[in-house]
């Protein structure tokens, strides 16, 4: 017969296990696997709350910070940051868009370096539905739409796409996750 005390201990053990797995996933240089992506999506509520630093605070202290509503799921390096940005977005009404590239959409071969991003995107669409925006460097109308909805988490996007986004963004809209410092930088 299970008691309330036993259930409390079991819940506490599950929380400790989840925290240990998150710590492993978030460690700098961690090799992210499909199992890590599954765990992170299935246990998003137990993910740590990651702080952010506004990089222009010294010369624009009154700039508005726009919470991320568009989440880039486009490269291996940005997947875990994308999930942390998603957790933040869920606290402010959820994501409106997942931003990706044609290369990620086509990466269905498990040997492809972009397969994990494709897998994560498909899992996210089932768990946390949002519109998918496939972006190219010269898609200025799409970029304006993304920026008009709020902040954009950009880690993992190709550099040729980052430049036009950053040029059109203004202050407080661009989010980047640093696994070394374990925080978001907002530009």
Swiss-Prot record:
Subcellular location: Host membrane; Virion
Highest taxon of the lineage: Viruses
Record membrane topology: Single-pass membrane protein
Keyword tags: Host membrane, Membrane, Transmembrane, Transmembrane helix, Virion
GO cellular component, one term: host cell membrane
Stretches that traverse the bilayer: 65-85
Protein name: Structural protein ORF187
Record has Nucleotide-binding as a keyword: no
Main subcellular location of this protein, as a coarse class: host cell
Lineage of the organism: Viruses, Viruses incertae sedis, Bicaudaviridae, Bicaudavirus
């Amino acid at each position: 017969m299970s008691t309330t005390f036993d259930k409390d201990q079991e819940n506490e053990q599950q929380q400790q296990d989840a925290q240990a797995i998150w710590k492993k996933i978030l460690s700098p240089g961690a090799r992210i696997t499909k199992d890590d992506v599954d765990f992170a999506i299935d246990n998003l509520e137990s993910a740590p709350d990651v702080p952010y630093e506004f990089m222009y605070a010294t010369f624009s202290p009154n700039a508005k910070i726009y919470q991320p509503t568009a989440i880039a799921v486009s490269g291996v390096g940005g997947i875990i940051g994308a999930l942390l940005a998603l957790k933040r977005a869920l606290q402010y009404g959820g994501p409106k868009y997942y931003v990706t590239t044609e290369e990620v959409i086509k990466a269905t071969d498990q040997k492809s370096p972009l397969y994990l991003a494709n897998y994560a995107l498909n899992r996210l669409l089932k768990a946390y539905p949002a519109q998918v925006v496939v972006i190219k460097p010269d898609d200025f109308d799409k970029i304006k739409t993304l920026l008009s909805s709020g902040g954009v988490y950009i880690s993992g996007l190709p550099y040729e796409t980052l430049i036009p986004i950053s040029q059109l963004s203004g202050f407080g809209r661009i989010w980047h996750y640093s696994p070394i410092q374990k925080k978001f930088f907002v530009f």
